[in-house]
């Protein structure tokens, strides 16, 4: 196969003419489109960087707010816990005072009932002694009868 230099030369000249025509009519438009696209991509990258920075700032702010809310929640919880403990202590103290009061009233009631019972026993003893004296005065009592009356008296008194 033989190389035809004239065909190669003409092809190169045709190519150069084609490039010159394309450059003259289309190169500026293509370059403008490429530059617009590059500018758009650069703007988008800047916007992404700005949005990323804003998102990071919002994240930090939200973390700070969340931490503050946690601390406030903890303070509120502690405050309510302290109030509950105070109420509990007051309730226990009131219950203890009420129990002491009931105990004192019970002791007073017991003492009163004891005194009442002692009074009744003394009254019965006096009544029995009077009754015994009346019987002794009504009858002539011999010693065995006297012992029997005393024994009955002791039995009734409960000694």
From Swiss-Prot:
Subunit structure: F-type ATPases have 2 components, F(1) - the catalytic core - and F(0) - the membrane proton channel. F(1) has five subunits: alpha(3), beta(3), gamma(1), delta(1), epsilon(1). F(0) has three main subunits: a(1), b(2) and c(10-14). The alpha and beta chains form an alternating ring which encloses part of the gamma chain. F(1) is attached to F(0) by a central stalk formed by the gamma and epsilon chains, while a peripheral stalk is formed by the delta and b chains.
Signal peptide: none
Assigned keywords, A-Z: ATP synthesis, Cell membrane, CF(0), Hydrogen ion transport, Ion transport, Membrane, Transmembrane, Transmembrane helix, Transport
Name this protein carries in UniProt: ATP synthase subunit b
Record CDD domains: ATP-synt_Fo_b
Organism of provenance: Clostridium botulinum (strain Eklund 17B / Type B)
Protein family membership: Belongs to the ATPase B chain family.
SUPFAM superfamilies: F1F0 ATP synthase subunit B, membrane domain
